[in-house]
Amino acid sequence: MFRVHLMEFCLLFMTGRDLQQISGNDTFKVGYLSSREIKELVPSFELQQKYHDLGVPTIEDILKFISGSVRQVILDVKVGPPLYEKGLAGSVVSSYTKLGCKNCVVWAKSDNIPRDVLRLAPDATVGYIVMMDPSTGTRTQLLRMRGAWVVGVYHPLIDGKLVKVLHARNKKVYAWTVDDEESMKKMLIERADAIITSNPSLLKRVMQDAKTQCLEDGFSLSA
C-alpha cells in the first residue's frame, strides 16, 4: 500500500514519518513544504549510510516500478495542506490512467475522494475505510458508498460477523495495518480477503505455517 499526497505541482508518495526521518525534524508534516523543498532535502548521515540514492518518488515513479509485478496496488490518498481535496481525485485518476494501471485500488479516510474518483472514472476500483471514530469512540458506518467493492477495516474491528456482512454485499475485506503474528493469524482465521502489513516477511511465514498445518491435518489447499 502506498500513501499519496497532493503537493503544489505533483503527487508524492510520502508519509509524515518519512519526511521527519529524511529531514531530521520530528515536527514536519508533508503539507508544510512544497514539492521542490521536499525534493531538495538532504537526508541525515545515518540514512545515507543505511540507504543509497534516497529520494521522494512521485506516483508515476512508483507505479512504473511496482504495478506490473504485484497483483494489486492500493493508493491510500491522504488529504491535507496545502490543497486538501481540491483536484486530488482528478490528479490520482490522471496519473494511474496515464500509466495504464489496471490493478490500482484507491481509498481514503475521506469518502469524498473515492466518490470523486468513481465520478471521473466509473470503472475504477475504489474502497472506503472503516475504523474507530476518534470523536465518538464508535465504529464508522460499515455499509456505505455504492460502487465501492473494497473495504479497508482497522484490523481489531474484524470478526466473523463483520466479514460475513460485507461478503454478503460482495465487498472485499482488507485488514490494516497488521504487523504482529497473533493478529495475522486471526485475520487468516476470520477470512479477511487481504492483509496490509509493514512486515511482509513475517506475514509470508505465518501464511506458510498455516498452510503446512492444514496439510498436516488432512486439508488440501489450492495455491
Residue ranges, per PLM feature:
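C-terminal active-site rim and adjoining tail of enzyme catalytic domains
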Residues: Q49, G127-A223
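Short glycine-biased active-site loop of nucleotidyltransferases that positions the nucleotide triphosphate
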Residues: L11, T27, Q141
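Hydrophobic aliphatic residue packing
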Residues: F2, F13, V56, I62, ...
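GT-A fold catalytic core of metal-dependent nucleotide-sugar glycosyltransferases
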Residues: M1-Q21
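Short acidic catalytic loops
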Residues: M1-M7, I74-K78, M187, D193-N199
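Hydrophobic pocket-lining residues within nucleotide cofactor-binding pockets
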Residues: M7, D18-L19, V30, P43, ...
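Metal-dependent phosphodiesterase/phospholipase catalytic core, i.e.
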Residues: T15-M131, R146-W149, V153, R169
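Generic recognition of cysteine residues
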Residues: C10, C101-C104, C214
